[in-house]
Regions:
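N-terminal helical cap/lid subdomain that shapes the substrate entry/recognition surface
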Residues: 1-61, 65, 80-81
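Asp-based, Mg2+/Mn2+-dependent phosphohydrolase catalytic module
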Residues: 31-32, 57, 61, 67-189
């Protein structure tokens, strides 16, 4: 998408990425801030650009054996259908999407809806998220255990406020899976 945004300009891919990292480290919406900085126009989101991280399916398979898994997402209508297309809906027990609920992260109500649907107590829940502002902060505000996964567009963010500090930080889904399954003393195979 970066190449699409900078097409026809004199801005290089490297310049865009460098500025994006700069904004991410300030915990700002890096894509939007970079686009504004360069005076560019945001392109439409293409659902066909959505991809799973390479270790997603394997991690979900392992975790689903021992845990109820839910997704809280700021997504348009059709979240379950997209998860089905990716072949992962069968590993997801609860899907709470903003377009269907009329409330979006970071509003704490969306987390409460997910907990209620999952039949899960707050002290039994773990929020795994890639964004500090939309995932970690609101989950911390309601007292949920938090794991920041430094993957995707927000991997370069730098927690500076107390509420931005996660209980655990992992680099990818494989590491997350390993850390969560370790206390169970299971091989995960």
């Amino acid at each position: 998408r970066i190449r699409e945004v900078i097409e026809g300009t004199e801005i290089t891919f490297e310049q865009f990425v460098e500025k994006k990292i700069f904004f991410a480290k300030q915990n700002k919406p890096a894509d939007l801030e970079t686009i504004k900085f360069f005076g560019l126009t945001k392109t439409s989101w293409h659902k066909e650009d959505e991809r799973l991280f390479p270790d997603t399916i394997e991690c979900l398979k392992k975790l689903h054996r021992y845990y109820k898994i839910g997704i809280i997402a700021n997504q348009s209508l059709g979240s379950k259908e997209r998860l089905e297309t990716f072949g992962i809906l069968k590993y997801i027990d609860v899907v709470v999407a903003s377009a269907e609920e009329g409330v979006a992260k970071p509003d704490k109500r969306i987390f409460e809806i997910a907990l209620q649907r999952a039949g899960c107590k707050l002290e039994e829940a773990v929020m795994v998220g890639d964004r500090l502002d939309n995932d970690i902060v609101p989950a911390n505000e309601i007292g949920m255990y938090t794991i920041w996964i430094k993957q995707g567009n927000w991997k370069d963010a730098c927690p500076t406020e107390e509420l931005e500090q996660s209980d655990m930080t992992v680099e990818n889904l494989s590491e997350l899976c390993e850390m969560i399954l370790l206390p169970l003393d299971v091989s995960g195979n």
